[in-house]
A protein has these predicted regions:
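Membrane-embedded beta-barrel scaffold of Gram-negative outer-membrane proteins
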Residues: 283-301, 411, 418-419, 452-506, ...
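Short acidic/polar hinge/loop motifs at secondary-structure boundaries
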Residues: 92, 110-137, 448
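Gram-negative outer-membrane beta-barrel transporters
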Residues: 342-343, 377-383, 475, 481-484, ...
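A beta-strand signature from Gram-negative outer-membrane beta-barrel systems
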Residues: 124-169
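C-terminal beta-signal and adjacent terminal beta-strands/loops
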Residues: 34, 205, 426, 576-582, ...
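Extracytoplasmic beta-strand/coil segments of soluble accessory domains associated
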Residues: 69-110, 131
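N-terminal periplasmic "start-of-domain" segments of outer-membrane beta-barrel proteins
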Residues: 29-63, 92, 100
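Periplasmic-side early beta-strands and strand-to-turn transitions of outer-membrane beta-barrels
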Residues: 154, 161-163, 171, 183-267, ...
């Protein structure tokens, strides 16, 4: 069997089986175009004990999601996602008790994390570009590098296909939001093409629970345009080239509950990559990849002076912040006859960041990494698959990190299995932590170019299985996870040269412990239900309090009705969040959790061929009022700080139309 045939088989089976534990499980097919080692890495890791969940494009369309964040929020077990103020906003993410910056984001395997603050948000990734989303849980630093501490989220863009086809869709919602999108794909001989584009605009809703009179811009609006092109060429059955380019232009409000007249980010973002896959023989395959991620943002903050309402320019339009991240990698797979196969690779990253808004000196960081993994061959062991690997990283200034992991899966029977991943991961300091120079005139903390990477030890252990039930299977998985983080980077006050604090590697170990249970079951021929519950205990060294911005517990549940060959489908999803703490300097620690939201969706096909469809969705059906963030502003009358809540999405109605061709 050739390498490409093996990849296609593994990827298809594992992508479909991974769907059994999320609401993505109702999909009719998952398009997997296994054109390189990079494409099928998540699916292959699942075979060796890594937990991988998948959302398909069809599930995204059926539920009426317009951006990546909302789809992840409701669909993936164990992943807490909290958009600040609805679609296309910054998000808080916690995967198995992690911080936002502990999760690596990728587009077609290309890292898109914002290393300025180590907390990149997918706030400009529209749903139209999605073929599927793959979520890998647990330490994923071996192949993916820094920030894969708790896992990785890979957004796979529209796949190639030989037959011409595509989609056009439009929608509008009750927050004065409008969406227009489409894509097309096909092939001319050995040349394959995909093009996609989308435009989203919304006036938004009032994002805070109270405003000072000086805040005159009170609705968070957005406008986003995204275009993308993919090109693939088969030089032969064994040599393939894939090229991706995607461009995003966005204007996103960045308002406050006091003094705001105009405040926004105007962003231009480019993501480009090229991959060359070469099967030298049936046993040896190589992948060469280069990438560029260029992020340029023009920021403006114009305020009103309380009382007089005189215009005050804090940051004039054109104030710059952004970064450029480029690099390359090589990966080789050697699978000789026998019981073992080998993977070897090299990564190079060059990163430059500059911020005039949050003063960060323009510095360049380079990272070189060598990694390898040894795996048991597909049929080497009757019921088990095992893998182990090592990665060495060396960055600018001699900063080093070495990580490893060992993983495996054992099928106790056809209906019961156990799997585990044990290893280490690392997190490089952000540009802010290294090079922040402080705001002139303020008593401000400082960056520290001598910081060492954070180091973590991770264990994931799962037991799962399935039982035949009706025409499908009842599937379940119970996962326990543990993570210890050393050399945590935080602001310290021990150095007398920095009385206002300086970033340092603090003493002590942050401990994360938790468990996740997910089940999925058919309820007759047309109905399916799924549910998950996650509990996390995340503590700083010497503390008995839950770390802020990480929920103690949360749960998700969904129900779908999708009869085969019927013209009508419907779904419901529930999202419950337990105790979740935020802290402000004036008001201390507060609990903003303990809320639940319900979404409903439905769509009907207008023709026998199911090319035309109309859908409706209702987000937050009961108009639950809940906070996603806490902040404080100064009262206009000078009486001091005022606590304000940033509110989640209110009850929102959406209408959708789509045409497949």
């Amino acid at each position: 069997m050739s390498g490409s045939d093996l990849r296609r088989g593994i990827a298809t089976v594992l992508a479909l089986s991974a769907c059994h534990l999320s609401s993505a499980q109702t999909v009719e097919e998952v398009l997997v175009t296994a054109r390189s080692l990079d494409d099928t890495l998540p699916a292959e890791l699942a075979r060796y004990g890594h937990q991988v969940d998948t959302i398909s494009a069809d599930r995204v369309a059926a539920a009426g999601y317009v951006d990546v964040s909302t789809a992840l929020q409701y669909e993936i077990p164990g992943l807490f996602v909290s958009p600040g103020s609805g679609p296309y906003d910054y998000v808080d993410v916690s995967l198995q008790g992690s911080r936002t910056g502990d999760v690596l984001w990728l587009v077609d395997g290309v890292r898109i994390n914002n290393r300025i603050f180590n907390d990149t948000s997918p706030d400009t990734l529209p749903a139209n570009m999605i073929e599927r989303i793959e979520v890998l849980k647990g330490a994923e630093g071996l192949f993916y590098g820094t920030q894969g501490v708790a896992g990785a989220i890979n957004i796979v863009t529209r796949a190639f296909q030989d037959e011409p086809g595509g989609n056009v869709n439009v929608s509008l919602d009750s927050n004065e939001g409008y969406h227009l999108a489409g894509y097309g794909r096909g092939a001319l001989g050995d040349h394959k093409f995909v093009a996609y584009a989308s435009w989203d605009k919304g006036d938004g809703y009032r994002q805070f629970d109270l405003y000072q009179p000086s805040a005159t811009d009170r609705d968070r609006s957005y406008e986003i345009m995204n275009v993308g092109l993919k090109y693939g060429h088969d030089f032969s059955d064994r040599t393939r080239l894939d090229v991706l380019w995607t461009h995003t232009e966005a204007r996103l409000d960045n308002n406050s509950a006091a003094r705001t007249r105009r405040s926004y980010n105007h962003r231009n973002e480019e993501i480009a990559s090229a991959k060359l896959s070469v099967e030298v023989s049936d046993t040896f395959e190589m992948l060469f990849k280069g990438y560029l991620h260029d992020w340029d943002t023009s920021y403006a903050n114009i305020q009103n002076r309380p009382g007089t309402m005189e215009e005050v320019v804090i940051y004039p339009p054109g104030s710059y912040w952004g970064f450029k991240d480029y690099g390359g990698s090589a990966l080789a797979r050697f699978a000789p006859e026998g019981k073992l196969e080998y993977h070897l690779g090299y990564d190079y990253q060059n990163y430059t960041a500059r911020d005039e808004v949050f003063p960060i000196a323009g510095k360049t960081e380079t990272v070189h990494a060598f990694f390898g993994q040894m795996r048991t061959a597909k049929d080497a062991l009757e019921r088990a698959s095992l893998a182990g690997g090592l990665r060495y990283n060396r960055g600018s200034g001699g900063k080093e990190a070495t990580v490893w992991n060992v993983s495996g899966r054992y099928d106790i029977s056809d209906a019961l299995y156990v799997q585990s991943v044990v290893g280490t991961a690392f997190l490089l300091p952000s540009a802010e932590q290294l090079y922040y120079t402080g705001i002139a005139g303020d008593e401000d903390y400082a960056g520290n170019p001598d910081l060492e990477p954070e180091q973590s030890r991770n264990v994931n252990l799962s037991i799962g299985g399935h039982l035949p039930l009706a025409s499908n299977a009842f599937a379940w998985i119970l996962t326990g996870f543990a993570r210890d983080v050393d050399d945590l980077i935080d602001i310290g006050y021990d150095d007398p040269e920095y009385p206002n604090g300086r970033y340092e590697n603090v003493a002590g170990t942050v401990k994360v412990r938790g468990a996740e249970l997910a089940v999925s079951a058919p309820l007759g021929e047309a109905f399916r239900a799924h549910a998950s519950y996650t509990y996390t205990r995340s503590r700083d060294a010497g503390s008995d309090e839950q770390r802020v911005r990480i929920p103690v517990s949360f749960a998700k549940a969904g129900f779908t009705y999708a009869p085969e060959h019927a013209r009508f489908e419907a779904g419901a999803s529930v999202y419950w969040v337990g105790d979740t703490y935020w802290s402000t300097s004036a008001f201390g620690r507060r609990n903003i959790g303990n809320y639940a939201t319900l979404n409903l969706s439905g769509r009907t096909f207008l023709d026998q061929a199911q090319r035309h469809r109309i859908g409706v969705s209702i987000e937050n059906v009961f108009d639950e009022r809940y906070a996603t963030r806490l902040s404080q502003v100064q009262a206009d009358d000078g009486t001091g700080a005022v606590l304000v809540q940033r509110l989640g999405v209110p009850q929102t109605f959406s209408l959708h139309y789509a045409y497949d061709f």
